[in-house]
A protein has these predicted regions:
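Glycine- and aromatic-enriched membrane insertion/assembly motifs of diderm outer-membrane
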Residues: 92-128, 307, 312-324
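Surface-exposed coil loops of outer-membrane beta-barrel proteins
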Residues: 77-97, 128-242, 252-259
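Short loop/turn motifs that connect adjacent beta-strands in outer-membrane beta-barrel proteins
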Residues: 51-66, 79, 111-119, 160-165, ...
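Transmembrane beta-barrel domains of outer membrane proteins
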Residues: 57, 106-110, 156-158, 166, ...
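Solvent-exposed loop/turn segments connecting transmembrane beta-strands
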Residues: 97, 113-114, 127, 197-202, ...
Length: 412
């Protein structure tokens, strides 16, 4: 039996084990009152909002948080490409093999009124740290192979101005996008197309100000659309408006404007918009994200490139540690400027998740099915054996069965 056969057998053994875990835990949680789930979800929603300190209580202690996690996954591709690649992807791009997709460790301290300086620092390794942050149309920054191992590296300061102006500088989490680079922070194991082609991290400086409990505005200056790309030496600029319109609804609009090619004339600057609407109630979360980008390309005739994407994830905590997610999405790269291939992609991802928190650890197991369909001049996914050196057949449809296992530690 070859290596691929052993890996596939291992995958199915893991799936069987996952299913046995389902049946065993179903007995444990059968008598659990549903109200506990609602209370847990309500608590999670409440803690995501800024809480007013009690004037009579002593000031909170200064706390550092330490965390680490490992993320292992297997993507079974029914096309079985010989190169083991999920085409045009920067995360979870290896199929038909068991991979360490991410391992990371970090520490952070958030700024507060009694300790105004904050810091975040994290290092990472794994398949998902290999290709993210790079551009399909621009050169890499010097030392990119080492810099990709930094997940966060920033300092922040809460200035005593009005309601509190927070300034952050360094390598910080992107203000664009609904999904994180880390699968543990998302509803699904694999990221949407719009997530892989927008920045997961930003390098630069940002300043945010809460005008009220519901409205926060942020402005930022960053080195480039992708922090590990270096098309030129001119920074990009942007801003975000966040509105907690109601108790259950959040709206965010983020725009970015800057050059992403060697010619930095204003007519060639890229404009990008990311709009997110999220609704939460008890154990149910619904979200809608729409992205659109455009720029003139410095080529004969100065053609205008256009791309857009949208996703509609729905997440439901079913019972106890069990939850399900469905995410339909669409991505259109008219000119191949965004993904590197001119294509229209439609995808559907469904996920079954089990979480097992124990003391300061959390284990997440996900079983996921994903269907992608790519049409167009540059569309398609790899299939089968190599036709000739470096050449593989393409097919418009790809079916994936995915098993992901994430184990994490958090000092909080």
């Amino acid at each position: 039996m070859g290596v691929s056969g052993l890996q596939r057998r291992l995958f199915w053994l893991l799936v069987v084990g996952f299913c046995r875990m389902i049946s065993a835990s179903a007995i444990v949680f059968a008598d659990e009152p549903a109200s506990s789930n609602a209370s847990s979800s309500a608590l999670q929603t409440a803690t995501s909002l800024q809480q007013e300190p009690d004037a009579a209580s002593p000031p909170p202690k200064i706390k550092w948080e330490y965390y680490a996690f490992v993320d292992v996954g297997y993507l079974l591709d029914f096309n079985h490409p010989a190169n083991h690649l999920f085409r045009d992807r920067s995360t979870t791009f290896k199929v038909d093999e068991l991979d360490l997709n991410m391992a990371a460790a970090g520490a952070k301290k958030l700024p507060s009124e009694n300790s105004r300086w904050g810091m975040e620092f994290a290092v990472q390794a794994g398949k998902d740290s290999k290709n993210f942050g790079f551009s399909a149309t621009a050169a890499n920054v010097s030392g990119a192979d080492a810099l990709r191992h930094f997940g966060l590296a920033d300092i922040s300061y809460l200035a005593p101005l009005g309601k509190g102006l927070t300034i952050q500088a360094g390598l910080f989490n992107s203000l664009i996008g609904y999904d994180s680079l880390y699968a543990k922070d998302n509803f699904t194991y694999t990221r949407p197309w719009g997530g892989d082609y927008t920045p997961y991290l930003m390098f630069g400086v940002n300043a945010s100000y809460p005008f009220s409990k519901k409205i926060t505005a942020t402005v930022f200056v960053i080195n480039d659309y992708f922090h590990l790309a270096h098309p030129n030496s001119v920074p990009s600029f942007g801003g975000q408006f966040a509105d907690l319109a109601a108790t259950r609804i959040t709206f965010k609009e983020t725009v970015l404007y800057g050059p992403h090619q060697a010619n930095t004339a204003l007519e060639f600057w890229r404009f990008f918009s990311d709009s997110i609407l999220e609704w939460k109630k008890d154990r149910l979360t619904l979200a809608f994200e729409y992205q659109v980008g455009t720029e003139k390309v410095d080529l004969p005739g100065t053609p205008r490139a256009l791309w857009m994407s949208a996703q509609l994830p729905a997440h439901r905590v079913v019972h106890g540690p069990w939850s399900v997610t469905a995410r339909p999405e669409i991505a259109w790269d008219r000119d191949g400027r965004w993904t590197g291939s001119a294509q229209l992609i439609k995808a559907l991802t469904t996920t079954l998740e089990y979480r097992f928190p124990y003391r300061k650890t959390n284990t997440i197991a996900r079983l996921e099915y994903r269907l992608d369909d790519s049409r167009g001049a540059g569309g398609g996914f790899f299939r089968g054996a190599e036709i000739s050196p470096g050449i593989f057949a393409l097919t418009p449809t790809q079916h994936l069965l995915i098993l992901g296992l994430i184990f994490g530690f958090d000092s909080q």
